[in-house]
Amino acid sequence: MLMPSHADCPADMSSPDHLKKHGKRKTVRENEMKKKRIMALLLCLGVVASGCGRIDQKASVQKTEHGFQGLEKQETSEDAPDVSAIAGGDAKEVLMVYMVGSNLESDSGLASADIEEMQQCGFDDDDLKVLICTGGTDSWWNPDIPDGECAIFELTEDGLDQVASLGDRDMADPQTLSGFVDFAYQSYSADDYSMVLWNHGGGAILGYGADENYGYDALSMRELDEALGSTDMAADGQKFEWIGFDACLMGMIEVADVLSDYSDYMIASEEMEAGDGWDYSFLRQMTDYGYYEGRDAASCVLDAYSSYYEDNYRYVPDYTLSCMDLTKTDAVKEKLDAFVLSAKQELKDGGYSKIAKIRDQAKSFGKVSEDTFYDTVDLYDLSDKMETLYPEESAELKAAIDDCVVEQVSNVPMTHGMAIYFPYENKDYVDEWLDIYGDIGFSDNYIGFVRNFTATLSGDPITDWHVEDTAPEEDVTAPGEYYVQLREDQVENLGHADYQLWMEDDGYEGTYILWMLSSDVSLSDDDKLYTNFDGKRFFLNDAEGGSVVCCALEIESGEDYKKYEIPLMLWRKDADLPENVYAHVRVDAEHPDGEVIGFYSEIDTDSTLFPQKNQVVLNEGDGVCPYLFAREIQFNEDGSVTPFSEWEPNSGTGAWITLSDDYDISMQEPDEVSNYCCLFRITDTQGNQYYTNPVYIEK
């Protein structure tokens, strides 16, 4: 069964006390329109998912000094509480939840599930007032929440009590958010205020929230700043105790910098959030222990988050969540400025590739495949790897980050709780994204450094490679080991390299199937690039003795681990059609043959611009087969083989296996070895890729 949508993918690779302390612009109109054009282009190209919901013009929102014009209390019953009466008694804290339901709700009911989780956790609704602003989705699974409008609810032990209606509003309009904050602040008196921003997140560039009813419109960082800065809280000098993002990729210094004028702490994830998001049982912990201040509340949030994923999943997904002290962001920016001023001088002195090599190795986030779309990296890890170039500046920046990130939970290596935008892999959108980035109002020195860096990144190749006429050679002193010889200038501008292992398909002459793509290569002192292939491949096994070989594509590597993506076709026992899923397998010292860390859906081209990371559960009796990528050898007129890049791509599926309850994916020696070919793919420090010719190895 052929799946042409995948054919080119691999070949071209287009009491929580135990928690540890880790340690301006172009015109607004021009940049906002540019952001919209980029989103539209991405949706059309299918690089990320597109929104096919109802697309309307933005409603005309008129905001008065008392919130929205026409904002009315919603009488849900004769006994519905009067808003002014609610405001009469002071609470310890008011928690505002800005819940943009989006496709997360219309497709899967995830927002409704989180509301139920909040309600059932048993928090004290006298001390903690939870107000939820709902909207941004085509339909709600919870029948108490109206479709087609934004509504405000108070959550009590008895359920949702609608206290106001905003009408049909775009939740990505700054006035919708500021109106909700004003309503809560004016109507509910409390010692402290906090807020959760719930939905999709795309980091500092793409912003937060995706209103399904308005073409997946999102709040940019400038718009988030505008929304919070225009509230009555801001006018009164009243800060939030904490603002948290139950959304992907928002744990960035740029986001923290925007929020620093409005909140004492920020809680957010550097990485894509695991499928179920936050565990809202933390509300009970807050009220039980009186943990309302930002630092204490963050401990509750982080503890519940990590415990939930460690305790409730067969395969524990990657998770990160951190709390930043927003009074310390200026110190981070100050040390970052000193850091990049040295780096800018390095660029002037011709040291681009030195910096690019380090950027290539830094921990990045948002990887849904081998390529990184979002171009965010862990700032501490980046600085740590830069220490060989700038020891003093690096040490001071790391100390500032360590001081700002007051708590962190993570099972992901090389994460320290604070990310930053550093364009490198996503070259196609560098220019336009930098215009959006400049509109945020972050560090001028850092933006200048990034612009200088990307000028070389997108410029003419520094080095002439011409490796397409070169094939790996067998080392005569070490039979079975293969290498390609590099020149000195090539080594200086080598970003990274990987090898591809293609096995001959015994059923189709001249066709080779990809079994492995791995960066497990090494560079010798005499500039020879070696493979470290040990003969093992990945197999899907079950307890009944079934076993089938799989294609494994490395998507991430660190100093002591590698992560592979294994494409599979899943046919559930009660389904009419199969679905594409991806197994993620981590290989490290503790699990040298691999450990499954989750199964994930194929990127949904009918979804939003933002990443999703919902786990797929495989059940006993489901059918699974590997998805295979192949290439057919092409010949020149004289009978010689063309360069590998000209081979005809193809794809299909392998043998099916019916799962028992106990199954795994692991690396092992195959019982039979076929003829295969091996080649290198070299990526230079400017992101350009080059393939060597293959070497053929007979069994």
Task: List PLM regions with ranges.
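N-terminal extension/subdomain marker
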Residues: A59-S189
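Sec-dependent signal peptide cleavage junction
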Residues: A49-K63
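Terminal, contiguous helix-loop blocks that mediate binding/assembly
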Residues: Q62-D90, Q186, Y208-F245, M250-K699
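Structural recognition of the beta-strand scaffold that forms the well-ordered cores
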Residues: V94-M99, K129-T134, Y193-L197, E241-F245, ...
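Catalytic-core segments of thiol-dependent peptidases
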Residues: T134-D236, A247-C248, I253, E270-E271
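Short, Lys/Arg-enriched N-terminal segments with co-localized hydrophobic residues
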Residues: H18-E32
